Amino acid sequence: EALTLANVSQLLWSAQGVTHPDGWRTAPSAGAAFPLELYLVAGNVNGLAQGLYRYRADQHKLIQLGNKDLRADLAGAAPGQEWMKGSAIIIVIAAVYDPATRKYGQRGIRYAQMEVGHAAQNVYLQAASLNLGTALVGAFDDKRVKEVLKLPSGEQPLGLMPVGGR
């Protein structure tokens, strides 16, 4: 079942949308470091071409990075999670630890990981309000996900959130 572009927009905003002129976001961030990066793997969205996108929270905008449907590739990088191929989209939550570790040392890694939980919970709540289903998948091969998405060396994938109709 296809998602609407409005639904996708709302899901991404719920995870990392800017809520204040100072750049604060929908999910709390230790020291306002905002280490998270969101990617969208679009497979079945009305009004949006299949492909890989980066979410620019500061502009509430998608930047297309590629036009290949990567849902099957991500499912292949997540053993036992083949069902992900059938989702309309997959939201990928990655972290750039540097902003958090610069301020908090190694503890910044923990703070970034906690922030993933906040962002994911917001997606869960927004999905439920839109009568959509999702799950936070952490069982994946980090290296393979980085390769599939061509993530920059400083970014670490921390969660995959397939979303579809219930």
What residue ranges belong to the model's regions?
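Small-aliphatic-rich amphipathic alpha-helix that forms the alpha element of a beta-alpha
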Residues: L11, L38, I89-I93, Y97-P99, ...
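Short, surface-exposed helix-loop/turn micro-motifs enriched in polar/charged residues
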Residues: A30, T134-V137, S153
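Short, charged, solvent-exposed linker or helix-capping segments at domain edges/interfaces
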Residues: Q50, R102-K103
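Short, mixed-charge aromatic SLiMs
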Residues: H60-K61, R144-G154
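N-terminal amphipathic, basic helical "cap/leader" segment at the start of enzyme domains
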Residues: E1-S87
